[in-house]
Amino acid sequence: MSKRRDVQSVILATMVGLALLPVWGCANRQQAVALYVDAVELRELNNNDKAIDKLNQATKVDGRFSLAQSLLGEIYEQKQEYKKSAAAYGAATRLNPWSFRDYFSLGRVYQTMKEFTLAVKAYRRACELKPSNFEANLKTAQCLYEVNDYSQAIVYGKRAEKIDANAEELHQLLGNIYDSQKDYEQAVRSYKRALEMDSSNPGVMMSLAVAYLRTKRVEPAKELFTAVTQIQPANSSAYQYIGYCYLQLNDVNQAIDNYRQAIKINSYDWEAYRGLGVAYMTKANAENDAELKAQAVELWRQSLSVKPDQPRRDRLIKLIEKYSK
């Protein structure tokens, strides 16, 4: 039997009932099914443009044929034509409002497009259709986090956790949500759980270390940032944070060394310039060194040059004015 006959047999066997529904008449539905079969075969041959033509014909012949819209959504998504993909998946959900697959796919495309509010709406419907689906709950939580709806993000995150408590990605997300809510102790617990599942993940290590800093645990934060530099020697942010930790621990020379390393890696690290300026000024005041004081002021100016709209900008300008006299 030919490949075409194989494709036809499989698809038609699963669509017998659908194909015979008298929506626009059996002839219309059967013609649409035949065009759909052609499109599936063309897609298998990587001829997506011709497959799209067949599917568009199928939707014109039978405007209620949801499977054609669903496959159009898949093909457009594969081609990274996301607006067209969303339109097709949206049409599929309107034609078949009980299709988990189409709502989930619609949410995924909106999430890719960073249309997070629309993604939430689609994913929530997917969760209604399959409440025990881990990915649907996880992605709903992700998108709610993106739109700053942290309380609802926690709700869906916890639902996902009940389904699969061993997903590192989920615990990292929960850590991010708790951090955004300023619940830093919960954030620490979530990041620790994520790190238990992937002990060498530098992203999780950085997040946990920052959470440690926010809970005044400087030493374990420094150790984690240092571990990150062993995995990612070019991670300027890790060195910048190590510099900050050493400042908090009153080790100015180590702070200076690490801030310098951060700037060596990334000459646009405004936080490292600012922190190095603080370290120099601290050392200058301790040693009554006018030259170090001048260098500190110049570093602060460089920080503002790199990022003029940085947080606490006014405070830094006042320091520059104070020590420039």
Tell what function each PLM region has.
Residues A13-P22:
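Bacterial N-terminal signal peptides
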Residues G25-L71, Q78-Q80, R94, K325:
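N-terminal leader/linker segments that initiate helical-solenoid repeat arrays
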Residues Q31-V33, S66-L67, F100-R101, F134-E135, ...:
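Helix-start (N-cap) detector for alpha-helical repeat units in TPR-like alpha-solenoids
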Residues V37, L71, S105, K139, ...:
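Canonical tetratricopeptide repeat
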Residues R43, S70, E77, F104, ...:
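Position-specific recognition of the canonical hydrophobic site in helix A of tetratricopeptide repeat
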Residues E44-K54, K79-A91, M113-R125, V147-R159, ...:
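Structural signature of tandem alpha-helical TPR/SEL1-like repeats
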Residues M281-N285, A290-K325:
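Terminal, low-structured helical/coil segments at or just beyond the last alpha-helical repeat
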